[in-house]
Amino acid sequence: KAAMVIPYDQTVLFLSEEQTVASLRADSILEHLQLHSASYRRWLGRPSCGGLFFVNREVYLKCGGENEHFYGWGPEDAERVRRMEILGYPVGVNTEGPLYHLWHPRGDNSRFFNRQLASNSRLELIRICNMDIKELTDDVASWRNRK
């Protein structure tokens, strides 16, 4: 039984503002999205694990919850999945259907403002991914004391 589930087939399809408006005006949003999927821009061209996940709250908090060493948008999604795996909690993936990303205005935290912040986030991902279960357990325990 998975402690975390990515509820889509790891494909993310981005809709433009016009496509989003048309979808939201349709009688059946899901049918509209599925009918027009081929016209939506595929994100990254590789499997994604971000944007949406379901998790056992108790297990997730035991695993540290959100890693606040990340700023902005980016590798925190992959870190979250890898951390769960290192700590021995299975992550499931639904293999039926993409994630549809509706257009929306972007806020300040939706991008990196400088290379140093982007680099710091990538280094945090690498740091976590290189840990074994004991190192990661100790590291997560230290997060509770950092405030």
Which residue stretches match the model-derived regions?
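C-terminal catalytic/acceptor-binding lobe
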Residues: 42, 47-48, 57-58, 62, ...
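Conserved catalytic core of nucleotide-sugar-dependent glycosyltransferases
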Residues: 1-69
